[in-house]
Design a protein with these regions (language model features):
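Generic hydrophobic/aromatic pocket-lining and core-packing "Φ" positions
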Residues: 13, 37, 57, 97-100, ...
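Adenosine-nucleotide cofactor-binding segment
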Residues: 20-29, 41-99
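Short glycine-centered segments of the SAM/dcSAM-binding site in methyltransferase folds
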Residues: 23, 108-109, 133
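C-terminal hydrophobic helical "lid"/dimerization subdomain
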Residues: 52, 142-192
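Rossmann-fold NAD(P)-binding glycine/threonine-rich loop
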Residues: 114-131, 137, 142-151
Length: 192
């Protein structure tokens, strides 16, 4: 679980050389998003969490995010139009990419690592107006995985999980469907 969570966010941030002087928005603060915040902060980027859930602000700040924006608050969202260099999109629910593309500055990159069940609908002018890019990331290899593990060990970066007994798997599923998990459930193999 740690490898999946970490690699899906580490690899694109490294590929696009996100770091000091960059403004990174992490869209969604769940299993992938919380690792994206940790990596973004450790790479030296200014990290903002974009979330539909205002109750996640305290978690975002605890993880090191510099800013937090509730995406349902149109005025707050407008205040960051054209602001970000990168958006790392970890959301697996359907959402409007055009809205988030407007938050990118010139040459900004929106990187999708979440996988919604329906296709994205994107207007051409959401991209061409500012020479913006829409990208995805799900690749890497053993050398990069080892690099990530070494980096995490050196910087004390770990995934936040809740360990559960196998007998509680149905309760964990119900909680997951309600969005009540910080940030992944892991089954204690000793409980099998």
């Amino acid at each position: 679980m740690f490898l999946e969570l970490s690699f899906l966010t580490y690899s694109p941030l490294r590929h696009w050389k996100v770091g000091k002087g960059h403004k990174l928005a992490v869209l969604g603060l769940g299993g992938l998003g919380h690792m994206a915040v940790k990596f973004g902060v450790s790479f030296g980027a200014e990290v903002t969490v974009l979330s539909t859930s205002p109750e996640k602000e305290a978690d975002a700040k605890k993880l090191g995010a510099h800013k937090f924006i509730v995406t349902k608050d149109e005025e707050h969202l407008k205040s960051v139009t054209g602001y970000f260099d990168f958006i790392l999109d970890t959301v697996s629910a359907p959402h409007d990419l055009n809205l988030y593309l407007s938050l990118l500055g010139v040459n900004g990159v929106h990187i999708c690592v979440g996988a919604p069940p329906t296709p994205y609908q994107t207007h051409a002018f959401s991209l061409i107006g500012g020479r913006k890019s829409l990208a995805g990331s799900l690749i890497g290899g053993l050398p990069e995985t080892q690099e990530m593990l070494d980096y995490c060990a050196e910087h004390h970066i770990v995934s936040d999980i809740e360990m559960i007994d196998i007998k509680n798997v149905h309760e964990a599923y119900d909680r997951m469907m309600k969005g009540d998990v910080r940030y992944r459930f892991v089954i204690d193999m000793a409980s099998l």
